[in-house]
């Protein structure tokens, strides 16, 4: 899924 870091950078994770 797509999650966002606290600093606001887009981070793509596969669950």
Curated annotation (Swiss-Prot):
Q: Predominant location of this chain?
A: plastid
| Protein's cellular compartments | Plastid, Chloroplast
Which top-level group of life is the source organism from?
A: Eukaryota
Q: Does the keyword Plastid apply?
A: yes
Question: Which BP terms does GO give this entry?
Answer: photorespiration; reductive pentose-phosphate cycle
**What protein family does this chain belong to?**
Belongs to the RuBisCO small chain family.
One further remark on this entry is: The basic functional RuBisCO is composed of a large chain homodimer in a 'head-to-tail' conformation. In form I RuBisCO this homodimer is arranged in a barrel-like tetramer with the small subunits forming a tetrameric 'cap' on each end of the 'barrel'.
What function does the entry list? RuBisCO catalyzes two reactions: the carboxylation of D-ribulose 1,5-bisphosphate, the primary event in carbon dioxide fixation, as well as the oxidative fragmentation of the pentose substrate. Both reactions occur simultaneously and in competition at the same active site. Although the small subunit is not catalytic it is essential for maximal activity.
Name of the protein described by the UniProt record? Ribulose bisphosphate carboxylase small subunit, chloroplastic
Tell me the organism: Physcomitrium patens (Spreading-leaved earth moss)
Phylogenetic classification of the source organism: Eukaryota, Viridiplantae, Streptophyta, Embryophyta, Bryophyta
């Amino acid at each position: 899924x797509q999650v966002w870091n606290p600093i606001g950078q887009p981070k793509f994770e596969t669950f």
